Amino acid sequence: MSKTAKKLAAASEKIDRTKVYPVAAAIDVVKQAAYAKFDETVDVAVRLGVDPRHADQMVRGAVVLPNGLGKDVRVLVFAKGEKEKEALDAGADYVGAEDLVSKIQEGWFEFDTAIATPDMMGVVGKIGKLLGPRGLMPNPKVGTVTFEVSRAVKESKAGKVEFRVEKAGIVHAPVGKVSFDADSLKGNLLALVEALVKAKPSAAKGIYIKKISMSSTMGPGINLDIADVTSQI
């Protein structure tokens, strides 16, 4: 057994897989079970009662986590003229148009999120096949295609998380770092779940939130008490 496998096994022993944990206890266990030498990300997986194969059951959106993500988010903006200046003033790391498209076509992806003004989407569309698979394509549904450039940049810098349900009906999203205090992780978790509840499709029938689990990057998953989570949002 490798050293990593031994550490994971030891971390797993801290968890009772037959039970669901209240939010506070789950966060405590996740922090205790983290064993990597780096500051692990805390991830949440939510299984929803939807079938994303049907367009009317797609769940997609974004939420600004109240306590951020604990990392410097590199923001790229496709804009010209006054909106270019607005983006720079708001703290965007890269702003441009065709010049940025050319860099991306050459294999440059040194950014975490991309924003575009609506008039730039004709240009951005040229690299849709490069941005889309990486989750970087600007989209009006999550507020990254907008003329409100300053707000979009500031939200991204503050810890905006985009979410989209996968084929299996699961949404994955980060809610912070292991080094965060428990209240900060809890606040981010509740904000994410609340956003998912608000994004519930009208076509979704039956139980909507079926399972919530939390883990650190290298750690085992912990199942949360859904009732405890939803009672706090």
Swiss-Prot record:
CDD domains: Ribosomal_L1. Binds directly to 23S rRNA. The L1 stalk is quite mobile in the ribosome, and is involved in E site tRNA release. Coiled coil: none annotated. GO terms for molecular function: rRNA binding; structural constituent of ribosome; tRNA binding. The keyword Glycoprotein does not apply. Pfam families: Ribosomal_L1. PROSITE patterns: RIBOSOMAL_L1 (PS01199). GO terms for biological process: regulation of translation; translation. Belongs to the universal ribosomal protein uL1 family. GO terms for cellular component: cytosolic large ribosomal subunit. This is Large ribosomal subunit protein uL1. It comes from the Bacteria. Part of the 50S ribosomal subunit.
